């Protein structure tokens, strides 16, 4: 599994391009996936994966139900009975940055529905989702089905900063920005 990141490095750091090449050179059949109409900013989209896992690990709220991921700022909404305290928000931010700092590999793996690991929530997939799914792994920290663009390693994300939060009728919103890593 570690070779996917090395292969992706030859394709501008895009793990999905590296995986496609890996399948081509192995003469594997190209997976048939649903179309994806979003053009995410890979560092912010990968940070969203880490934030989702962190929120679920700490508060058992599942992944964000509503999100909007952009280069300038991003927001994720979580189903929670009450807002997080300022201290809890600082803990979330610190944990996300800790994971980013581990320089974890971000890889994709194509699997059939029968091969999905236990614990992966498929409830948000469209009803017409293909039989083959693309799982995105952020090291051993997170895994979920995803068609978006990601960085090759978490150290390419930069610093994660929660800039504001709000709470309305059981929905806790986190707005975050990224400071690009020093080159």
Feature map (PLM): residue ranges:
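Accessible peptide chain termini
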Residues: 1-2, 28
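Small-residue-biased low-complexity repeat regions
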Residues: 2-16
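Active-/binding-site microenvironments in catalytic and ligand-binding cores
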Residues: 9-12, 21-183
């Amino acid at each position: 599994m570690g070779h996917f990141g090395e292969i992706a490095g030859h394709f501008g750091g895009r793990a999905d391009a590296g995986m496609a090449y890996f399948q081509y050179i192995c003469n594997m059949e190209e997976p048939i996936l649903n179309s994806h109409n979003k053009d995410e900013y890979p560092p912010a989209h990968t940070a969203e994966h880490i934030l989702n896992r962190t929120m679920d690990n700490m508060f058992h709220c599942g992944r964000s139900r509503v999100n909007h991921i952009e280069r300038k700022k991003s927001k994720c909404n979580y189903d929670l009975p009450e807002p997080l305290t300022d201290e809890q928000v600082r803990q979330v931010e610190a944990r996300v940055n800790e994971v980013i700092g581990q320089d974890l590999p971000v890889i994709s793996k194509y699997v059939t529905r029968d091969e999905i690991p236990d614990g992966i929530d498929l409830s948000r997939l469209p009803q017409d989702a293909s039989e083959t799914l693309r799982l995105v792994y952020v090291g051993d920290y997170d895994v979920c089905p995803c068609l978006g663009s990601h960085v090759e390693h978490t150290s390419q994300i930069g610093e994660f900063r929660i800039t504001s939060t709000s709470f309305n009728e059981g929905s806790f919103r986190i707005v975050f920005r990224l400071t690009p890593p020093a080159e």
